Amino acid sequence: MTDRTCLSIVLAAGEGTRMKSNLPKVLHQVAGLPLVSHVVTAVQGTGKSDIALVVGRGADDVRAAVEKNAGPVSAFEQKERLGTAHAVLAAREAIERGYDDLLIVFGDTPLIEAQSLQKARERLAEGADVVVIGFRPDNPHGYGRLIEKGDKLVAIIEEKEATEEQKQIGFCNGGLMAVRGQHALALLDAVGNDNAKGEYYLTDIVAIAHSKGMNVTAIEVPVDNVIGINNRVELAEAEAIWQQRKRREMMLAGVTLIAPETVFFSHDTLIEADVIVEPNVFFGPRVHVATGALIHSFSHMEGAYVGPKAEIGPFARLRPGANLGEKTKVGNFCEVKNATVHKGAKINHLTYIGDATVGASSNIGAGTITCNYDGYNKYKTVIGENAFIGSNSSLVAPVEIGDNAYIASGSTITDNVPADALAFGRARQETKEGRAKILREKYAAIKAAKTATK
């Protein structure tokens, strides 16, 4: 298989009107990745393949989304909507380059797996000329039926055209197919539009190929592989299936999910073995959690690295650029953004650390914030090793706190603090004996006077 060339035609020109959205359908996301990018990822999982993207509405945006993850692709605009075969032929220029295999896939089927497409390509390598990907739903009503004679596929019959006997067939058309490259254009050009809608249907190439004595066959894949997305309900269903797959994959790889159904991953989440994830945790894009870490409930992460044996949460938020070293702690109601926290440092409660470096073994007290933004620009806070930042401190960047320095609680620090120094940045306390009693009597009298006038 590795020496066979392949062109994958990704049909992504559908209007998607049932999505009720200004966004092209294929750019809606599952697990933080556009539908069409899931499909391209699966295609690339079969081995080296050139990509021909057939686009319509939002063509530039669709192409940009695909290339962000897949690298350069060829894009072809389908200017008229005249059926699936017509859509494939929009990429005629690419097909004419000549390939061993032609994969035809749909940009709105994000759950298709690489192994399913690989299986279709393997059939081509074994001698098939056309391979249709089929499935067996619990209820086949509404789907085109795959009509077989022995191990050969002879036709695809749509539900409305099927006889009662054919409607009993449970093997249905998944829409995706693989075609031997040398026959692709001849088969596609032979498709006519003699039907009620006057459209050119890709499914017709099955009967055409069979009539020419070609080897046409079908393979069966799991039902979820061919689920197409047409509305927001189906989008949510696809998300649920994807998450279920990912949770299983994570647990089989050595990650403990205490309540799997409450944990949500992104398409690129990387979690190493022996990590424990408590209930109700969300992983956004670009998160890597190293071995032995503990993620407590209600934590939200994106664009973050969590080091070995680190502890996060509960109710912690890690934003892009958070880089937490080994055995660090980011506790409840803490937010870390664009900051490196070195080994053993603790940020336990009610704290914001942004655009900062926290040295090894330092302790950040409750309520501490780095004041990193003046409304126009961001500035950096550097905290040395083994520093102690007292509770309710404000560190006004740019500022540096030296190794082993102490910051008194309640301080506002605007100047650099040398190593081993103790810094205060607050008003001196004054205590007035008996004043509280006088104030209580005064305020009670005011309240009583207001009540009497009502």
UniProtKB/Swiss-Prot annotation:
Binds 1 Mg(2+) ion per subunit. It is found in: Cytoplasm. It is an enzyme of class 2 (transferase). Residues 254-454 are annotated as: N-acetyltransferase. Pathway: Nucleotide-sugar biosynthesis; UDP-N-acetyl-alpha-D-glucosamine biosynthesis; N-acetyl-alpha-D-glucosamine 1-phosphate from alpha-D-glucosamine 6-phosphate (route II): step 2/2; Nucleotide-sugar biosynthesis; UDP-N-acetyl-alpha-D-glucosamine biosynthesis; UDP-N-acetyl-alpha-D-glucosamine from N-acetyl-alpha-D-glucosamine 1-phosphate: step 1/1; Bacterial outer membrane biogenesis; LPS lipid A biosynthesis. The keyword Hydrolase does not apply. It catalyses: alpha-D-glucosamine 1-phosphate + acetyl-CoA = N-acetyl-alpha-D-glucosamine 1-phosphate + CoA + H(+); N-acetyl-alpha-D-glucosamine 1-phosphate + UTP + H(+) = UDP-N-acetyl-alpha-D-glucosamine + diphosphate. Acetyl-CoA binds at residues 366, 372-373, 391, 409, 426. GO terms for biological process: cell morphogenesis; cell wall organization; lipid A biosynthetic process; peptidoglycan biosynthetic process; regulation of cell shape; UDP-N-acetylglucosamine biosynthetic process. Homotrimer. This is Bifunctional protein GlmU. It comes from Brucella anthropi (strain ATCC 49188 / DSM 6882 / CCUG 24695 / JCM 21032 / LMG 3331 / NBRC 15819 / NCTC 12168 / Alc 37). The gene is glmU.
